[in-house]
Amino acid sequence: MKFTKITLTMASLALASAAFAKTPIVNTSISEAEVLAAQKGWGDALIAISDTYEKSGQPAAKALAEKVIDGAYGYNLGPVLFKPTLTEVPQTFRITRAGALSYFVGGDSTYPKDTGFALKGWKKVNVENAAIFLAGDVATSMGNVSFTDKNGKVTTVDKTWKFKKDDLGNLRIVVHHSSLPYSSK
């Protein structure tokens, strides 16, 4: 009887070991390098939308912006907490994909004051992080982002992003807050 119990226990452990050996290991933790790559990708995409607008017009820029939003933001996960720089009440916050798209490329009568932030002739985007906080499958960054337009004029904003790694391992922006730096003048 004792031999049978030991044999059954050993067999169970062997089967369990085999099952664990074949189980894929997935690391959902976000690294600093992934955050930096996502920020660079966001800036490059903004420039690409701006260039597309200049070369091919608003409909082409809108089509590209839709792809960028679908690839970079977490609207597929739920509402994104997006507070763009140049919005005002009652449309300050853009928790839907349609609201974000309108902010970037305009043309949506629901958001009549949107002129398309991504259509401003941006040629360079530079991110300077004050800090990046990493916590498993989420990461938060805060710092300044400077945008250089086709005339060389630089606009700098304070920016906070929160990224979440989705089930496919892609970083998604789930919080995006942007504001002009405070000036006492």
Give the ranges of each region predicted by the language model.
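Gram-negative bacterial Sec-dependent N-terminal signal peptides
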Residues: 1-21
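Short, low-complexity N-terminal intrinsically disordered segments enriched in polar/charged residues
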Residues: 20-72
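Mature soluble domains of exported/periplasmic/lumenal proteins and thiol-rich metal-chelating peptides
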Residues: 22-33, 106-112, 120-123, 185
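Short beta-strand segments enriched in hydrophobic/aromatic residues
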Residues: 46, 145-147, 177
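A solvent-exposed, acidic/Ser-Thr-rich amphipathic alpha-helical stretch
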Residues: 55-129
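Acidic, glycine-rich flexible loop segments
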Residues: 111-150, 157-159
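Short beta-strand edge/turn micro-motifs at domain boundaries
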Residues: 134-142, 151-184
